[in-house]
Design a protein with these regions (language model features):
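Glycine-rich acetyl-CoA-binding "A-motif" of GNAT/NAT acetyltransferases
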Residues: 61-62, 194-197, 248
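Residue-level detector of high-confidence beta-strand sites
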Residues: 198, 221, 261-266
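Acyl-donor-binding surface of acyltransferase catalytic domains
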Residues: 36-146, 152, 265-269
């Protein structure tokens, strides 16, 4: 048996690769959505900078295991119940760099990898994934108050969203603008076109970055309902990843019928050399040293 290595999955194979995750639907729907996202994005840019989609030894057909690195975002998934191929793949990632393991379902495996490779954890953010079938979202009755309108976001809104996003860090504005440009979105606007509320669709097909200019006006609920219905009309089931301590968001989504389905973690490692993206400013802003 040869030495393990990470092998990029060719663009010509992405549709076949995506379809592996149709089994036991919708168990692997988020992985399906993630691959479909990059299929869609490849039509905008055939060579997206700082994006690599890896399998272990080119074995994705056998086990559905992948590690995707998109700038600082790191995604992982496997159909291998033993997790062996995912473990071996994670041990080959260059952890000298700072990554955010997005919606990680394999927290124990990742922490074991960090321990083995002497990688320090920056921070972990426990989340709960909420789910709503598209059939339920299609029933939403979206009523827009007089003087307001709903519509897609524009690239120029990225700075406003970034400035008000509590989890922003270096590179966030670019990442948010890319989502606005290439994915569906929803904004709430006043008569002058000023942005009042917003929600984005992230790479795994999860509703994210929900925000409003003013609290306690019902803007967040209106945006979520409108966006969920829009996505359902596109044939999508609805997902949201919510911090376990974010009681207002849990109440909002729960009140609309979203149900918690699994626990995940957003895990940041500490980089081990001077790099463009660093976790240290983010930790400093949180008062963590």
């Amino acid at each position: 048996m040869g030495e393990d290595r990470l092998v990029e999955i060719p663009r010509s194979d992405w549709e076949e690769w995506r379809d592996l995750y149709k089994r036991d639907w919708p168990r692997h729907e988020i992985a399906f959505n993630l691959v479909q996202n990059y299929i869609n994005w490849s039509k905008h840019d055939r060579k997206i900078k700082d994006l690599v989609l890896y399998s272990l030894n080119g074995s994705w057909r056998e086990n559905g295991t992948f590690v995707i690195i998109d700038r600082i975002d790191l995604y992982m998934h496997t159909l291998d119940e033993s997790l062996d191929t995912l473990r071996r793949a994670l041990e080959l990632v260059d952890w000298d760099y700072y990554y955010v393991a997005v919606m990680c379902e394999h927290e124990a495996l990742l922490f074991d990898t960090f321990k083995k490779l002497n990688v320090r954890v920056g921070i972990g953010r426990a989340n709960t994934v909420y789910f709503l079938p598209k059939e339920e979202a299609l029933k939403f009755n979206v009523t827009v108050p007089a003087g307001l309108r709903l519509g897609s976001l524009e690239p120029g809104h990225a700075k406003i969203i970034t400035d008000l996003w509590p989890h922003r860090e270096r590179g966030s504005e670019f990442s948010i603008e890319r989502l606005v440009r290439w994915n569906p979105s929803m904004g709430l606007f006043d008569e002058q076109g000023n942005l009042l509320g917003w929600c984005l669709l992230t790479q795994p097909g999860v509703m994210g970055s929900l925000g409003v200019i003013e609290q306690r006006k019902g803007y967040g609920k209106l945006v979520v309902m409108a966006f969920a219905k829009k996505l359902a009309e596109m044939g999508r089931n609805l997902y949201a990843s919510i911090l376990v301590e974010n009681e207002p968001s849990k109440a909002l989504f729960g009140g609309l019928g979203f149900k918690p389905i699994k626990d995940v973690n957003w895990i940041r490692n500490r980089e081990r050399k001077f790099v463009e993206w660093s976790v240290e400013p983010y930790l400093a802003a949180l008062g963590i040293s």
